Amino acid sequence: MTSPCSPPLKPPISPPKTPVPQASSIPSPPLPPSPLDFSALPSPPWSQQTPVPPPLPLPPPPAATGPAPRHVFGLEKSQLLKEAFDKAGPVPKGREDVKRLLKLHKDRFRGDLRWILFCADLPSLIQEGPQCGLVALWMAGTLLSPPSGVPLERLIRVATERGYTAQGEMFSVADMGRLAQEVLGCQAKLLSGGLGGPNRDLVLQHLVTGHPLLIPYDEDFNHEPCQRKGHKAHWAVSAGVLLGVRAVPSLGYTEDPELPGLFHPVLGTPCQPPSLPEEGSPGAVYLLSKQGKSWHYQLWDYDQVRESNLQLTDFSPSRATDGRVYVVPVGGVRAGLCGQALLLTPQDCSH
């Protein structure tokens, strides 16, 4: 099967970049103010007649109550994000969010199959501007460099210094792999030729073992995959998969008490890997994904993701005329994103 992108099996090590469109330069964002250096402040006048009393001790910090604050990069600069943050309810924990999602979509699942859920817990992070790829990498980094990965600001800084991005955008899967290896210290395997064929089994086995997958795709209005020829190119991270199987292996799985027919691997217990659904079996594989415009997991049909990823060929006309600079590899979106994805594993992992 041929794809419309026909990417090379191995990406070039150092592809030159072509800025699109023309612009002189992008001003660097202002540096945050440095903390006050109290030792540099002038000492108050001293007198034998009026001794200065010692300062009162600071009150103890308030006790932490409720869930930890959500990660929102750019909240201090964006009024829109502030308003959305204030109106939003608490973010559910990973497993609670997945359970909510499965209950919401239970009518989509084939009744002739049993379902096994493999899902690593990912944090959420809301992007600011065209940072979807770096935000997806940050989320993946929490599984690769525990306990909390690396700061998003560092990913942005290194990507900018290496010439991978001008303002947070990432139009090259190969560059994303180089960035992940350098900053997260992980292994990065670039898949080309689409998510079907032999790559399909690689992806599913990767997700079953709990490792993250970075996927470029075209984003619809509800953040789901669509087909816009790359005009809505976006990034997501998947760290979970829902498999429809004829029979659940007897070793290491337990049925969900609230959703009959759904099984989970038992933590801390060896489990027999399930047989992967055959390619071409409709509605048998779903990816659990997150992306930088929502707090929540999303459930996507694997074939829908594969088709969206395989048609990323053109640079968005609206971006080409917005007066900003974007770093695009030689060969454009077709060469940088089409039919490609990134498998990430910890450095010490033999998988």
UniProtKB/Swiss-Prot annotation:
The active site is at C132. It is found in: Cytoplasm. GO terms for molecular function: cysteine-type aminopeptidase activity; initiator methionyl aminopeptidase activity. It holds the Pfam family ACTMAP-like_C. The modification Phosphoserine is found at S316. Residues 124-244 are annotated as: Peptidase C39-like. Its EC number is 3.4.11.-. The N-terminal proline-rich disordered region contributes to the interaction with PFN2. Belongs to the ACTMAP family. Interacts (via N-terminus) with PFN2 isoforms IIa and IIb; the interactions may facilitate efficient cleavage of the acetylated N-terminus of immature actin. Interacts with PFN1. This is Actin maturation protease. It comes from Homo sapiens (Human).
